[in-house]
Structures are given as C-alpha cells and as structure tokens.
Amino acid sequence: MSLKRSIAGCVASLTLAVASYATPANSMPPSPAGMHTLRANGDHFELDGNPFQILSGAIHYSRVPRAYWRDRLRKARAMGLNTVETYVFWNLHETSPGQFDFSGQNDVAEFVREAQQEGLFVILRPGPYVCAEWDFGGYPAWLLRDPNMEVRTSNPAFIAAASRWLHRLGQELAPLQSGNGGPIIAVQVENEYGSFGSDHKYMEQIHHLLLDSGFNRAMLYTADGADELPNGSLPELPAVINFGSGDAKAEFAKLDKLRPRGPRMCGEYWDGWFDHWGEKHHTTDPDEEAKELEWMLAQGYSVNLYMFHGGTSFGWMNGANIDAGKYGPDVTSYDYDVPVSENGELRRKYFLLRDVIQKQTGITPPAPPAPMPAKALAPIEFKASTPIWDSLPRPVASQQILSMEDLGQNYGYILYRTNIAHAQSGELRINELHSYAQIYLDGIFAGALDRRLDQSSLSVQIQHDNTRLDILVENSGRVNFGHQFSHERAGITREVTLANQPLINWQIYPLPMDNLNSLDYKARLCTGACFYHASFKVDQPADTFIDGRSLGKGEVFVNGRALGRFWNIGPQRTLYLPGPWLKTGENEIVIFDMNGKPDPTVPMISNAILDERSN
C-alpha cells in the first residue's frame, strides 16, 4: 500500500462518519459552528462520535439569486433540515483556461458561510463532473477546443485541467471544511461515475486530486445508483445511493447486499423531476413521498432531497439528455416540483415533509420566513427593434465548417454564410447539427431543422446563381448525462452538403450575445430573427414572471442579465424575473426572438406557467 493510499484511507475514516439515527427526541440539533468530524461507523454516520442522521436538501447557489440565498437557507432550516447540499459548477468559475471568477453570484464560499450562519451543515459536490441538468455537466466548453480531449477519463489534458480547477476551488472552500471550523462535513468524489464507466484508476485520480487540493478535513464519499455502485465506488470510501420516489425499499435492499457494513443514505432522493422542451411537465405525489421519507427516517437512514429548491438555469446553462438516441434539451426553469417553488413559495409538499421530519426527530423547527409572493407588473410595451442581420460582428473566414468551440465561443448562437454559385435544387444536409437551425436563402426563410426531432436535411430550390445561404444555429444546451460528452461541440460540427456536394468557403459569425450594448434599434418592430428593446418603470421591485406566450423561440435579457430561453412549444411559457434584479425606476429589457413578430406587448404576471404545451 502506497503512503498516499494509506493517508487517503485514514482521511476517509476520520471524516466519513454520519450516523443513521435521528437526533434524540426533543433535543437540539448539533450546531455547525466550531470544528466537527463526520465519519461512517457501520451502517450509520457519527458526528464527533455521536449518532447523526443527515437530513439534507439540495440548493444550487447558481440557480438562486444571491439576494435570496439566505431566504432559501432559512426555509431549509424551517423544514427541519440540518444540512444543505450543492454542486459546484466548473464552467461558471473558469470561463477561460486559468481565468477564475468567484465574485457576486459565483461566490460559492459566501453561500457556504451563510449556510453555517443559518445553522446548517453543507455537503459539497465539486465534481468536476456534476450532471445537474446543466450545460455539459458543468464542464467548461473550452475543454472541447482540444480535438483530442476525452473528458471524464484519465486523458492527461483533462486531468491537468481538472487539477488546476480543483486546486483553485480548494483555495476558496477547503478552509470551510468542518475539520477547520466550517460547515462542510462531506465532499463527494466525482458524481454517479458508475453510470458512465468503470475505470477505478480514474476515480482514484479524482479522489487524490481532491485530497491534494485541500479537501482532507471533511468526509469524502461516492454516490451512484445502486445498480452502478460497483463501477463508481471506491473501497476505501463510504458509498451512498441515488433513487427516485417509490424506490426506497428496493434500492436500500440492494445496498444491503453491496455494502452490508456501510452507512445507509440516499444521496439524491428525487422528490420531483425536470422537464424537456416539447414534452410534458413532471410532477410527483407529495403524499407518497411523505410516506416514503417517513419510512426512511424511521429506519435511521440519512437522506438528501434532490431538490429542496430547484430554482432556475439562468442564461444559457440548461443541459440536455440523449435518450434512445433522441436529443432532449432541458427547459430554463428548474422548478422540479419540489418543496420550494422556482420563486421561493412553499408548496404543500414542503409542509408534509416538514411534519414527517418533526415527527421523526422530535424537534420543532423554526417558523418559515415570511412569504414574498410574485406580483403582476405593468405590461411591457415594445416600440423598437433591429434584425439580427443588421448587427453582425466581423466574420471568421474558413474553407471548412468550424464549431463554436473552434472559435472560442461557449454559448449562444452562430451564423454560417456561404454563396451557392449556380441555380439548382436538391437536399441541403447539415451533418451533426447542435442543436437548432434556421435556413435562409438570400434573406428569405427556407425552413428549420431541429436536433430534438432528429432533423438534418430539407429540400431547397436555389433559383438564382450566386444565392446567399445563411444558417443561423442555436446551441440549445450540451448533453449533460451519458456517453455523449466528447461529441458535444456546438454549432455545426461536420460538413454541410447540397445535392451530396460539400459546401465550402464559409463566413462564420460568432453570436455569443454576451454584450448587447452596441445594438442600433429603430423605432419599428421587425419580423423574423430580431432583437426587441424596451424600457419600463418599476415603482417597487418584486418577483414577477415574463409571459412568453406571444413569443417564438429565443432568449430574454433584463438589465444586462440573461434570464434564459423561451420556446412556444412549451411546457414552460414564463420566465422567472427575480425582484432583486429589477431597479426602482427605469429598467431595460431585450428579447431576441428567432421567430419574431410585431406584437408590441409582453405581460408580466404573478404566476409561473410550466405545463402548457402547444398543439
């Protein structure tokens, strides 16, 4: 046994104990203040040598406006939770190689400190892969600029990038581990790796990277589905399992066989589910979940609710899935039908689970914070717009097609332009479209292709020589789960052909839409792919929802912040606009709509619409 492995085993035994017994009735829960040691002891966890049952809920700092972190944490404490869990999203913090951002909304250390101040321990899941229905599973898109990159493997280039990231993250969060007086009692190694592969050498590399990055004063552990646990776990670390509502007894029975001496914990209890564009809105039965949670707690098992509060995948950060070969991009809302809604309202599910926790622990939690209901604000009147064609940046000339990543672009849109020399008819084929394209001939819309529908070609009539071909492509979200990672470059990633002949000599326009200040609006409303601009007054900022039922497909920006995507196929038809992102007085909104039409009014309403699909 190597010295490093020996040290790792000692660290695991020191830091991975969480007892599976509830806090004694009518006692106070342990405080996260001071130094603590969490360890696994047989089938339960212990905190400082005393049995400790983890009652956790997931809240992702990046999906909640910073001004609301404390409100959501207080609501977790008021439900009876003693712990919160969060992923850390690499792509938010290292937006280009070696350039890190932990400020403002990205100040994850402040989120952890606020959790401690509110009486909560923290489970940290730093990945580097996180899944989470998040673009590229949290990996930064710039990794894919390397044509030989193989993420989530022992590929030297990937390990070097992951090492730099985790070491920098350690500077932020290692001091906040429970062994150092912080609230972080546990740190997850990778994330459900057993669903991806079985390379234990790779898992050991990530384990040791975390230790070397300073994550050695909290319990390290792994998490997988029970069936995948042998592939994704490490023998020296505790292993927890993830499953959805209705599966608890069967999944824990599997864990009993796989790890008869290990702690009993559900690392992700899916008390809701996420949505894809064009598919149904998911809900789960709160009464059945309350019964199942009561059973788990009565057994002394520890639980992390995934999610407690889902929030919003603001901007471009929604992920996607590949299921049986079908691409499914996630909606902007991460409401998840969980105890606390997208805008922070407490659902019936919240109070049912709260009652269960109080009954099982004997502890009366504090009262929830006062509600902050969303409000309807005055409708926004649009009077100015500009077509995207009037606002193109300097193009990149290329003989062949280039992806977004080839051009150093991470998110947004990209325009491919070339000339067709001779009039002809035939099939226009886009090989490897990622993810949605509109095709224009001499500025006239000719059709759209959607990866979601497995569309890659359409018949076109080129009626004139020297016809301009424009292909406007949206990156609808990179796949975040499965074996698709190394193929998730955005834009067009292979050739475009017309009548089986490759098209060349492209002018390529990156359109990240990260700065819209230079747009030149005219006092009219255009149609097609357009930017629409308006100013609107707010007397008292409050949460509200932008009603997108009159819009087509695109993105909304308010006061320079990208709120997220809208699409008239549903099921999501509103976009959450947090009150703290509004100003008293004048505010600015920009809507980019690929299918724009001159409808001058967009309402702002008091409720989310998450379950309305087009016919």
Predicted features, each with a name:
Residues 25-83, 113:
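N-terminal carbohydrate-binding accessory modules
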Residues 54-65, 90-107, 144-164, 188-199, ...:
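The substrate-binding groove and active-site-proximal loops of carbohydrate-active enzymes
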Residues 69-135, 207-212:
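Aromatic-lined substrate-binding rim segments of carbohydrate-active enzymes
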Residues 98-106, 117, 127-153, 203-208, ...:
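Aromatic- and acidic-residue-enriched segments that line the glycan-binding/catalytic groove
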Residues 107-124, 147-184:
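An active-site-proximal structural segment forming one wall of the substrate-binding cleft
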Residues 158-234:
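Active-site neighborhood of glycoside hydrolase catalytic domains
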Residues 212-213, 217, 245-341, 345, ...:
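Catalytic-core region of carbohydrate-active enzymes that cleave or remodel glycosidic bonds
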Residues 426-440, 469, 536-559, 566-567, ...:
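Aromatic-lined ligand-binding clefts that engage carbohydrates, nucleic acids, or primary amines
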